[in-house]
UniProtKB/Swiss-Prot annotation:
Name assigned to this protein: Des-methyl DIF-1 methyltransferase A
Similarity-based family: Belongs to the class I-like SAM-binding methyltransferase superfamily. Cation-independent O-methyltransferase family. COMT subfamily.
Record bears the keyword Methyltransferase: yes
Pfam families from the UniProt entry: Dimerisation (PF08100), Methyltransf_2 (PF00891)
Annotated S-adenosyl-L-methionine binding sites: G195, D221, D250, L251, K266
Function according to Swiss-Prot or TrEMBL: O-methyltransferase; part of the gene cluster that mediates the biosynthesis of DIF-1 (Differentiation Inducing Factor-1), a signal molecule involved in the differentiation of pstO (prestalk-O) cells. The three-step process begins with the formation of (2,4,6-trihydroxyphenyl)-1-hexan-1-one (THPH) by the polyketide synthase StlB. THPH is then dichlorinated by the flavin-dependent halogenase ChlA. The last step of DIF-1 biosynthesis is the O-methylation of dichloro-THPH (or des-methyl-DIF-1) by the methyltransferase DmtA to yield DIF-1.
GO molecular function: 3,5-dichloro-THPH methyl transferase activity; O-methyltransferase activity; protein dimerization activity; S-adenosylmethionine-dependent methyltransferase activity
Swiss-Prot/TrEMBL catalytic activity: (3,5-dichloro-2,4,6-trihydroxyphenyl)hexan-1-one + S-adenosyl-L-methionine = 1-(3,5-dichloro-2,6-dihydroxy-4-methoxyphenyl)hexan-1-one + S-adenosyl-L-homocysteine + H(+)
Enzymatic class: transferase
Amino acid sequence: MISNSDCDENLIKQQQQEIQDKNFLIDVAIGYTKSNALSCALKYKIPQLLEDKSKSCKELSEILKVNCDNLYRLLRTLSTIGIFIEDEVEDGVFRNSRLSNLLRNSNSDSWVNNVYLQSHPNVIQSFMYLDKTIECGTSQGMTSQGFSSAWELFEKDKSLNAHFHNTMTSFTSDEIKTILEYIDFNQYKSIVDLGGSSGELLKSIAKSSRGQLVESFINFDLPLVINQNKVNNENGAAEFDKRYSEVASDLFVDSDYPSADCYTLKFIFHMFNDDKVLTILDKISKSIKPNGKVYVFDHIVQPKNQPYAPFYFDLQMIVNFNGKERSQNEWKTIFEKSPFKIDTILILPDSKRMSVIELSLKQ
């Protein structure tokens, strides 16, 4: 028999759970305030201004030439989620927290670039058009803001473009050790990285013992990217391995890709719909040397009803790129329609985000 006290206890638990659920949903609904507040703090470079010291809002507002009271309210709000710390004794005086201290570093190989990228105003605003994207079936995040594509936005906003490509570089830096544990690139004479950004993947392979026998490394990307790489080199980057070169072009122009016996594509296919992925694969099939291989480094979405970052990337892909994150079955469906067959699917055990699909031409 269930006692009255048991019933009361269960009722209290249900009520507490309901309160937690309501608070959670409210927190999700107002999530844009957090991302916009963070975006604003990054715009004004507050983490860098604070450095290792405490500064008053009055001092910060004079440096930034902004309203002191509103700046205080911004930093006070961010301090409630651990970004910045307000002095317990003196009102309006802030210092960097453990979290905001991380945001001081925006070097090209730093993961922090992804924070800057995700909190950029145009990226945040693009999600205002998620409903339109769902309704019409094509990306509306950029076109609704007056850009023909995300690439046009990157071309116009050099800072955002740098954060985007630096984010790609940081992803490679995080994963290259695991990649080299599973793939020996010495079996290939030439490697082309399609959409290779700063060339971090090829440079890392060339430096490793698993790339010493490779004769040619070609980094293929858009002129905007390759031109920026040249500027970076002119600004002090040491001349790299003579086996390394770069080609400025577009994945979808009529010209062929550079010929090679190995092609790599790292987080490229998820930015395109199935038809464009098939177009790229068809072009590779016309340029790849006999017995060549293609390595696709990308997400393979797996769990259902669980917190999983690639599902959020998936929404970004449909809003901004007309792309998608794919399940293993979706990848198989694409490759069945292509000139390539799957040789191996490897879910890297030490990777937070990446799997490897190894392809070769169908006989």
